[in-house]
Amino acid sequence: MSNPELEVYSVKEVAEILKTSRQQVRKMILAEELPAVKVGREWRMAAEHLQDFILNTIE
């Protein structure tokens, strides 16, 4: 079962989008401010969750 429309971002990509450091993104993930899942040794975030985070932050 796969969804070709499901887009995910790495910590590096999220950091670039949010204009912050990878370390800050990891801190936000561990503080459960950003929803993410760990795949192997790497964190991944669904594009939909990142969009929700951005929209909720600016409101």
Each predicted region: which residue ranges?
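A short, Lys/Arg-enriched interface patch at domain edges and termini
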Residues: M1, L50-E59
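A detector for short, charged/polar N-terminal pre-domain segments
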Residues: M1-E7
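Residues within the helices of the helix-turn-helix
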Residues: V11-K12, V37
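The alpha-helix within a helix-turn-helix
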Residues: A15
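Major-groove DNA-recognition helix of helix-turn-helix-type DNA-binding domains
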Residues: L18-R44
